Amino acid sequence: YTTGEIRYVGEGTTDSDEDGVVDSVDDFDTDPNLASIDYIPDAGTMGTLTFEDKYPVKGDYDFNDLVMGYKYRHILDPENKVKAMHYLYTIRAMGASNALGFAIQFPTINASVGYSATLEKNSEGAIETTAQAGKTKLTFNIFANAKTELNSGSKFVNTAADGEEGEDDMVVTDLPTYELIVTFNTAVDSLAVAVPNNPYIFYTSSPNIEVHLPGQVHSSGVSTLSNYPSHSEGDEQDYLTVNGFPWAKDIQSMWDFPKEKTSLENAYPAVITWASSEGSSATTWYNDETAGYLQYRSLRKTAHQSYIRNTMRSVVFRGKYNFLGL
């Protein structure tokens, strides 16, 4: 992702706010407490978080049970510490019969840290929010039930291929967006918020059942998996099957996900090599798709992507300072 460039005084250029960072690279050249913005994945790209919800069993493995788009901005002070985080999400698709929620945890930031936070849906006005109680690390719920957020009832959303929609499928282009803004009382080390952090889904009816990216842990440190007495297929401490397949993936582009009931292995066969090599080979397996197995392979894909990009752009790029209220 893009890292804010800090250039210090002494190179013969103006430093209006006298913070030691010259105006030409100071994104906040009138504020001595702020200096630059990190864009994640980068200033012109939206990332994808995609989840399979059947953990700890593999399920149909179509990897579209919840598909989230994201764009992040970290606001740095002159010492390259993070003063604020601006996290923007949108629901791209939902192919789950289970009702699922979505949350983000910062696994190296203690819940006791001093902060203020707001959460805003669809640019309807920011509302003060607080981190989840009972967590040792800073954790925020973005929403509790994707079905409710999409007004979908029992239907799947944006996962059937064109012309294959059935009575249980919906096409939604007016997608909800969510802005989480966290401002720290004291700036934190940039490594403390290094992506991908710990985004995860949880069962609305059983929030203790969570699905995380590989290498991450349950938000409370341990999962009882109360409705799964045996979970020999996976290790709850690394969220990989015994054969090395994940239940979630962070892809730093607008990824074309498999259509409903299409296995990830069929849509992206190189993932098999990636899994068997423990991630050392086929590291860009998500770019090697198989035609006919993916969602949005028609003109609708263009319209869908255009809507998301325009929506994200209108929210994120509202000015140099406005999104922080500065």
Kindly give the residue locations of the regions a language model identified.
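A eukaryote-biased signal for long
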Residues: A144-L326
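C-terminal globular interaction/adhesion domains in large, modular proteins
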Residues: A126-N145, E149, G153
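Short N-terminal edge-element motif at the start of the domain
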Residues: A43-V82
